[in-house]
Amino acid sequence: MMIMRKKHPLIKLINHSFIDLPAPSNISSWWNFGSLLGVCLMIQILTGLFLAMHYTSDTTTAFSSVAHICRDVNYGWLIRYLHANGASMFFICLFIHVGRGIYYGSYMLLETWNIGIILLLTTMATAFVGYVLPWGQMSFWGATVITNLLSAIPYIGTTLVEWIWGGFSVDKATLTRFFAFHFILPFIITALVLVHLLFLHETGSNNPSGLNSNSDKIPFHPYYTIKDLLGVLLLLMVLMILVLFFPDILGDPDNYTPANPLNTPAHIKPEWYFLFAYAILRSIPNKLGGVLALILSILILAAFPLLNYSKQHGLAYRPLTQFLYWVFIANLLVLTWIGGQPVEYPFTTIGQISSVLYFTIILVLMPTANAVENNILKLH
């Protein structure tokens, strides 16, 4: 008689995804971040659920309800900081996961890559509406500035912004709907993750060599379950160090001041994980142009499969494109730094140069390097 895990309709799904799944024998630790993202998502949903039990989405009580969670709820401070810093860990894993996909050419698994881009956008939307909920100064002004960008859309812009706000400014209606969005979106993300995995398991995983690994597969369990478990322990260690020793290091001090529509903070900026896109937005003097650049800074990921002219899979044996890749990563870090700086010389100029470089590397330099490498290696 066949063992239950191979026969039971539900358990066999888990078996095919996490136990008997044939995986390449040579995938490195860069492949750990998918499972780490799953763990981050579970942490966020669980801590978020407990926070939602005590939070009130009303402009008069939202700020004090967060203070109440931290002061009066048993381990409320821990749940709140796990949720806030868990979001940062989520984005660190997300950026590394995408970066690995670019480096090793995983974008050639088209359906998986495109669902991944949708996941990235959905996660960014979730984080944005979540940041508004504590109703501090930066929550309020961040919501005002970012939603106001939609007014740049010709003809329908102003109407659209007021429709999203539920009035003529960011107010009670906005906070209530943002809470509703923040509650529902993680479950949509979970559904998309399942679709992401479904498409990945249709083709099988990529590997560092970029070669077909069908002739050399090993079972996911125990090899990669143990490897993933080590990654999870390291992730939890870093998260707990952040939460217990430096809970506010990634936050903004302005968010400890209750929202005040009559007093604008000196420097309005989003959370650190949006700063690169914010820098690109600010580097264009025209409002509509800035909004388009902001959207394209993420959607440009969809262009990677179209701009890949290389005859080799991944960058493991392509030093020219490898160099450009690391310049691209360094440029992203520069953009992140610029996004957190005031709008004045020399930061504006550095931001503009970095923004141009961001798009130039992806659209011009990398495809050119692909063609040059093909030519050098006589891969026609």
From Swiss-Prot:
Pfam families: Cytochrom_B_C, Cytochrome_B
Family matches, as InterPro entries: Cyt_b/b6_C, Cyt_b/b6_C_sf, Cyt_b/b6_N, Cytb/b6-like_sf, Cytochrome_b, Cytochrome_b_C_euk/bac, Cytochrome_b_N_euk/bac, Di-haem_cyt_TM
Cofactor section: heme b
Quaternary structure note: The cytochrome bc1 complex contains 11 subunits: 3 respiratory subunits (MT-CYB, CYC1 and UQCRFS1), 2 core proteins (UQCRC1 and UQCRC2) and 6 low-molecular weight proteins (UQCRH/QCR6, UQCRB/QCR7, UQCRQ/QCR8, UQCR10/QCR9, UQCR11/QCR10 and a cleavage product of UQCRFS1). This cytochrome bc1 complex then forms a dimer.
PROSITE patterns: CYTB_CTER (PS51003), CYTB_NTER (PS51002)
Superkingdom: Eukaryota
Family from the record: Belongs to the cytochrome b family.
Protein name: Cytochrome b
Record gene name: MT-CYB
Organism: Thomasomys notatus
